[in-house]
């Protein structure tokens, strides 16, 4: 059985794309990432796992700005604390047996099949409420870049996300 993931190359001139791999074939992930991989589990926008080159920083792989923005948007504790170097591959969270699953359909659609995006923030004292504005973006990474820049300038921002407009 195959599972689907979203490949995010470090080279921003290259598009992100869906890649299907056989479930449980970790050598397929190694081939995509280019070596031994590490996994970062994220909870937002939906529980997922980002597979990265485990030695990307040590061997001097290039910064993956798009994957880093997704990581930072998943939880503000990552902001300016870490970056992803080299290619990244997003799959679903592990199942009850610890096996990797395919990327959740809503996350795949958000990255690849959404025509227009808006950004939202949670601010100090807003509880679970999200607030946005009228800005719209055609690219998810343009939206992420904008909202993360906003969070840098506006210190009341505690969390960020992008959603379909």
What are the functions of these language-model segments?
Residues 1-16:
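Short, extreme N-terminal segment that most often corresponds to the first beta-strand
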Residues 29-36, 136-161:
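A short, charged, amphipathic alpha-helix used as a generic interaction element across diverse proteins
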Residues 44-73:
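Short, structured protein-protein interaction patches enriched in aromatics and acidic/basic residues
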Residues 75-102:
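Ordered, amphipathic secondary-structure segments that act as subunit-interaction surfaces
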Residues 38-47, 81-89, 118-125, 153-165:
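Short glycine-rich, low-complexity/disordered patches
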Residues 98-117:
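Surface-exposed beta-loop interaction hotspot
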Residues 15-45:
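Amphipathic alpha-helical packing elements
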Residues 111-132:
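Short aromatic-glycine-(Arg/Gly/Cys) micro-motifs in beta-strand/loop hairpins
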């Amino acid at each position: 059985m195959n599972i689907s993931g979203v490949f995010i190359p470090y080279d921003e001139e290259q598009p992100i794309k869906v890649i299907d791999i056989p479930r449980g074939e970790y050598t397929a992930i190694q081939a995509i990432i280019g070596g031994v991989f590490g996994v970062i589990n994220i909870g937002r926008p939906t529980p997922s796992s980002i597979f990265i080159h485990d030695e990307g920083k040590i061997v001097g792989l290039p910064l993956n700005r798009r994957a880093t923005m997704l990581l930072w948007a998943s939880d503000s504790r990552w902001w300016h604390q870490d970056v992803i170097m080299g290619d990244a591959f997003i799959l679903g969270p592990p199942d009850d047996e610890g096996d990797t699953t395919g990327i959740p359909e809503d996350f795949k659609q958000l990255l690849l099949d959404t025509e227009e995006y808006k950004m939202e923030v949670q601010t100090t004292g807003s509880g679970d409420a999200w607030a946005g504005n009228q800005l719209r973006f055609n690219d998810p990474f343009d939206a992420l870049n904008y909202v993360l820049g906003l969070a840098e300038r506006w210190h009341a921002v505690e969390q960020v996300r992008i959603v379909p407009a």
